[in-house]
């Protein structure tokens, strides 16, 4: 599940990158349906993630910083569980 951390995604976007984002959020424990559509539930999950890890900018847009933080946290979890 690779997603380009230089892109950004927001409500209304669709496609494989959104599926990857939803999968990553799900791996981190957020209740998101992997549909490939950046819907309201996905936006709420992104906002919740941002609220926890980047409280200075909670906008529901999966930007480069949000995606990089999510990748980094999942890498840490993977190395801890290995």
Regions found by a protein language model. Give the residues of each.
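Cell-envelope/ECM-targeting effectors and their regulatory/trafficking segments
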Residues: 1-82
């Amino acid at each position: 599940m690779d997603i380009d951390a230089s892109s950004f995604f927001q409500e209304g976007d669709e496609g494989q990158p959104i599926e990857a984002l939803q999968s990553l959020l799900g791996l981190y424990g957020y209740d998101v349906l992997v549909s490939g559509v950046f819907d309201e539930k996905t936006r709420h999950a992104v906002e919740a993630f941002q609220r926890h890890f980047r409280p200075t900018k909670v906008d529901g847009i999966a930007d480069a910083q949000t995606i990089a933080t999510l990748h980094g946290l999942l890498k840490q979890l993977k190395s801890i569980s290995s």
